[in-house]
A protein has these predicted regions:
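Short Gly/Ser/Thr- and Asp/Glu-enriched loop/turn motifs at secondary-structure junctions
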Residues: 304-310
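ATP-binding N-lobe of GHMP and related small-molecule kinases
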Residues: 2-125, 139-151, 334-339
Length: 339
């Protein structure tokens, strides 16, 4: 892993400059939408913190109309404005500072901008709202400045806002390759040409409030202190390859088992950190135990969990009625339904 200051903005700025024209001005107000995503094979740990490069590849499924709507237009005041879910945020807040820093990579004349984001899912609750938020912001900036960048470049740029944002530029299944180059130019996401209309996801809410520790802080703590982390990158890379193969084969049982094992291995690695890091709550384990009991009865349902307490169920349409009846607080998502 490359040890460099996390506040060193010169390196990301150079990466943006390589893809953006020297003369750049806001052409028009713009709006964009990006879906949130759930990783079926997860990344945890970075080989370069400044460039936001992962130690392992990952693969996700996007969440259709669960995501972020973002609008950008000139501000009516002399300074930037950042709005989230209808609330104007203090400019010194962590979220606003991240948005403004990202805007600064694009603009040249420092024209004050107003950014409005509305999430259709709980913010900071383990549902990757930062991923959809920065993906939508990247797409909106591409439109606002009339850049017409290809999606592989947009994916690389979105990475500087949130690693998982690289995967939220598309619907469906998306793979983010870790890349090998030191400059990160080969670390971007790509959509997989895999259509699976029967595929379902259900979000079982456990805690929809802010997490006690951000994913970024939790990741850094795990990498630095967990004795189990040394085996994670190689296993996670192998899991990503195997999940991809299971998808191509439409082998749902293998896909589900791999995704669940990958998530549990990640949480075990976090819980082995010193001091322990545990995002899961007692109700999370209750949901898992209910799911495992259902599987013993022949129901092909699997689980995955990101850095949060909520449990995501993976199943096919044949199990949808059972899931709705037995996990009655769950919200079922059909990723391949047309909007």
């Amino acid at each position: 892993m490359t040890e460099r200051s996390l506040t060193d903005s010169t390196i990301p700025a150079a990466c943006f400059a390589a893809h953006l024209p020297k003369r750049l001005s806001l052409c028009q107000p713009a709006a964009a939408y990006a879906p949130s995503n759930i990783a079926l094979a997860k990344y945890w740990g970075k080989r370069d913190y400044v460039l936001n490069l992962p130690l392992n590849s990952s693969l996700s499924i996007s969440l259709a109309d669960w995501g972020s709507h973002t609008q950008i237009f000139p501000a009516a005041t002399a300074c930037d404005e950042v709005w989230l879910n209808g609330v104007s945020l203090p400019l010194d807040s962590v979220f606003a500072q991240k948005i403004i820093s990202f805007l600064n990579f694009f603009r040249r004349d420092m024209l004050p901008l107003r950014v409005e984001t509305v999430n259709t899912l709980p913010t900071a609750a383990g549902l990757a709202s930062s991923a959809s938020g920065f993906a939508a912001l990247t797409l909106a900036l591409d439109k606002a400045f009339n850049l017409q960048l290809c999606h592989s470049v947009l994916s690389m740029l979105a990475r500087f806002g949130s690693g998982s944002a690289t995967r939220s530029l598309w619907h469906g299944f998306v793979r983010w390759d870790r890349g090998e180059k030191q400059d990160g130019s080969d670390s971007f996401a790509r959509p997989l040409a895999l259509d699976w209309p029967e595929f379902r996801i259900a979000i079982v809410p456990v805690d929809t409030g802010p997490k006690s520790r951000s994913s970024r802080d939790g990741m850094n703590h795990t990498v630095a202190t967990s004795p189990l982390f040394q085996t994670w990158p190689a296993q996670a890379e192998a899991d990503c390859t195997d999940v991809h193969r299971a998808l191509e084969a439409r082998d749902f049982a293998t896909l589900g088992a791999l995704s669940e094992a990958n998530a549990l291995a990640l949480h075990a690695t976090m819980m082995a950190a010193r001091p322990a890091l545990c995002y899961l709550k007692p109700q999370s384990w209750s949901v898992l135990e209910q799911l495992w009991a259902a599987r013993e009865e022949g129901h092909e349902i699997y689980a995955t969990m990101d850095a949060g307490a909520n449990v995501k169920l993976l199943f096919l349409s044949s199990e949808e009625s059972f899931v709705r009846h037995n996990f009655f607080t769950a919200s079922v998502i059909r990723p391949f339904d047309q909007p």
